[in-house]
């Protein structure tokens, strides 16, 4: 499930980092089982809905380091840039304007790269 949502390159990089860190290796294994093996794999919500909920939760929690990867995942799952924008704007009412503004800034490069790639122009990532 993790590879399906986040993509091979992200997962390969994260697994290599976890393998190189004996202190947090067990925690990473636990987090992956709970997140991808139990939560994202449950019935009842489709992956697009789970992805939008994740963007909201990360925005409310101020977890900007995870937002870009999950925006990229949302786009991979067929969520449109407009749906991402509306999700972040909706979250602003609950997370606060500064948190939402920071979320927009964190997500903008991923959405821009996606739109650029869809338009046929070379994809540019910062």
Predicted regions and their residues:
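Short alpha-helical scaffolding segments that buttress acidic/His motifs in well-ordered protein cores
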Residues: 31-35, 52-59, 87-92
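Acidic, glycine/proline-rich low-complexity segments that act as flexible tails and inter-domain linkers
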Residues: 1-47, 76, 102-126
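Mid-chain, well-packed structural core segment of small domains
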Residues: 52, 56-85
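Short Asp/Glu-rich motifs
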Residues: 93-94, 111
């Amino acid at each position: 499930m993790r590879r399906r949502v986040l993509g091979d390159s992200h997962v390969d990089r994260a697994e290599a980092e976890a393998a190189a860190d004996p202190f947090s290796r067990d925690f990473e294994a636990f987090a992956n089982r709970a997140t991808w093996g139990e939560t994202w794999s449950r019935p009842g919500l489709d992956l697009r809905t789970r992805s939008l909920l994740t963007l909201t939760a990360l925005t409310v929690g101020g977890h900007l380091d995870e937002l870009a990867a999950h925006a990229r995942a949302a786009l991979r799952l067929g969520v449109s840039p407009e749906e991402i924008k509306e999700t972040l704007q909706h979250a602003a009412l609950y997370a606060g304007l500064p948190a939402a503004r920071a979320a927009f800034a964190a997500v903008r490069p991923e959405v821009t790269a996606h739109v650029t790639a869809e338009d046929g122009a070379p994809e540019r990532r910062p």
